[in-house]
């Protein structure tokens, strides 16, 4: 672990790269990520059509909608991995393109839907990769402690010495989430983080999102499970045919008519008897 950290810092020092100033955290409720009039097409197929939204610190924003609605494309544009045909993404009121990759890596972390690690690294070394952006910053931080905390939060401490390729799909997903947490950014974008997980670990991942939001972070998460979105998200953006059909708190936008129309399948909404959270049930 220390070898990786020392190597990263040696590369920065030896290359003459500019040292970076650590980012200042912003207060809860601040818009840190914005999308304005985003559109994207692939050939004749329009994937996103004039989509705008704001992401605020202290909130979990869930992107939901049926397959092909544009959720992952929207997230990919927000991360900068995919350029929009029209529109603009801003990070902290600056155009996304105005940030260098190194500056951006100190401010936002991305958990992709799929991931590969080409070499048989130990799990702990994979998580340590999340600390790489901080090698260019003069801060007194115990990287080993940050990594240990991230691994404990995602319950992968016992996997530390395992080779990453040997893990199950769910184990890999939790390790990659630990890597994102170890990056310690105030903005996080997660693409279907619960897809490969059992119910206990699905709940655990979304509890982490809520905890990080309570600490002032901004989390954007793509979810298929409407129950998870209703239980853990502060705001939801319901995508349908490349547009935002509704945006707001789950209790306000999860209506039977809207969801039935969006998913082309009749559903009903009932309130959880204990929490009052809306439950979306298919009509059978």
Swiss-Prot record:
Function: Part of the ABC transporter complex HmuTUV involved in hemin import. Responsible for energy coupling to the transport system.
EC number: 7.6.2.-
Protein location: Cell membrane
InterPro entries: AAA+_ATPase, ABC_transporter-like_ATP-bd, ABC_transporter-like_CS, P-loop_NTPase
ABC transporter domain ranges (all copies): 33-266
Keyword terms, alphabetized: ATP-binding, Cell membrane, Membrane, Nucleotide-binding, Translocase, Transport
GO MF, any single term: ATP hydrolysis activity
Membrane-topology annotation of the record: Peripheral membrane protein
CDD domains assigned: ABC_Iron-Siderophores_B12_Hemin
Gene3D superfamilies xrefs: P-loop containing nucleotide triphosphate hydrolases
Organism in which the protein naturally occurs: Thermobifida fusca (strain YX)
Alphabetized NCBIfam families for the sequence: PRK13548.1
Residues annotated as binding ATP: 65-72
Record's protein name: Hemin import ATP-binding protein HmuV
Subunit structure: The complex is composed of two ATP-binding proteins (HmuV), two transmembrane proteins (HmuU) and a solute-binding protein (HmuT).
Location, primary (coarse class): membrane
GO cellular component terms listed in the entry, alphabetical order: plasma membrane
Gene, per the UniProt record: hmuV
Family of this protein: Belongs to the ABC transporter superfamily. Heme (hemin) importer (TC 3.A.1.14.5) family.
């Amino acid at each position: 672990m220390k070898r990786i950290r020392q190597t990263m810092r040696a590369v920065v020092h030896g290359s003459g790269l500019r040292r970076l100033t650590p980012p200042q955290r912003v207060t809860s409720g601040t818009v840190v990520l914005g999308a304005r009039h985003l559109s994207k097409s692939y050939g004749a197929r329009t994937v996103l059509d004039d989509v705008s939204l704001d992401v605020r610190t202290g909130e979990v924003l869930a992107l939901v909608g049926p397959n092909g609605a544009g959720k992952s494309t929207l997230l990919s544009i927000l991360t900068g991995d995919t350029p929009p045909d029209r529109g603009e993404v801003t990070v902290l009121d600056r155009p996304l393109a105005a940030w260098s990759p190194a500056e951006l890596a100190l401010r936002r972390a991305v958990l992709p839907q799929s991931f590969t690690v080409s070499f048989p690294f130990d799990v702990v070394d994979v998580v340590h990769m999340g600390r790489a952006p901080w090698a260019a910053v003069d801060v007194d931080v115990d990287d080993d402690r940050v990594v240990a905390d991230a691994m404990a939060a995602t319950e992968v401490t016992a996997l530390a010495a395992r080779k990453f390729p040997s893990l199950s799909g769910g184990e890999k997903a939790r390790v990659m989430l630990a890597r994102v947490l170890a990056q310690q950014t105030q903005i996080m974008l997660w693409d279907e983080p619960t897809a490969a997980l059992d119910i206990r670990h699905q709940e655990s991942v979304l509890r982490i999102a809520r905890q990080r939001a309570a600490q002032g972070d901004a989390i954007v998460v793509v979810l298929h499970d409407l129950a998870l979105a209703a239980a853990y998200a502060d705001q939801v953006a319901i995508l349908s045919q490349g547009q935002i059909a509704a945006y707001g708190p789950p209790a306000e936008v999860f209506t039977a008519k809207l969801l039935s129309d969006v998913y082309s399948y009749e559903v009903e909404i009932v309130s959880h008897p204990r929490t009052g959270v809306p439950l979306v049930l298919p009509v059978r």
